[in-house]
């Protein structure tokens, strides 16, 4: 069993955190986020740290304990530094560009794909083959990156498509004559 939940979450400098029952709110230089914990988890603010404890020792409560602590740590990191996910595009004629705030992708379809990012997410295109998705909500940044990758995921024979920058594609050998 993981014991990550036992460690209190320190509130970083420059962030104000408040605990109101099951809700933790964090305000920082990048914005404001909140997390509502399950009823089986109790939250307390002690010595500039959020202490997460399960209400009872049921398996269900213990399973939500570490997750709640990690979520609180994530909102603190998000309002302080933010999160970003980098994507790379491989393939002849595959490229990305920005049209205002929308992302335009040429991925070998008969039409260009236009992706409108949700509120709170910023998309940057430093090169036509690179996309950087950034924001303060870790889950939302990952979701947007996954949606962009889904338009044309990397294929195993030539590696063409959209992939995460840190992703390794297992390549397959073509058929032999």
Curated annotation (Swiss-Prot):
Molecular function terms from GO: rRNA binding; structural constituent of ribosome
SUPFAM superfamilies: Ribosomal protein L6
Keywords: Ribonucleoprotein, Ribosomal protein, RNA-binding, rRNA-binding
BP GO annotations: cytoplasmic translation
Pfam family, one: Ribosomal_L6
Entry GO CC: cytosolic large ribosomal subunit
Function: This protein binds to the 23S rRNA, and is important in its secondary structure. It is located near the subunit interface in the base of the L7/L12 stalk, and near the tRNA binding site of the peptidyltransferase center.
Complex and partners: Part of the 50S ribosomal subunit.
Family designation: Belongs to the universal ribosomal protein uL6 family.
Protein name: Large ribosomal subunit protein uL6
Species in which this protein is naturally found: Rhizobium leguminosarum bv. trifolii (strain WSM2304)
Lineage per the UniProt record: Bacteria, Pseudomonadati, Pseudomonadota, Alphaproteobacteria, Hyphomicrobiales
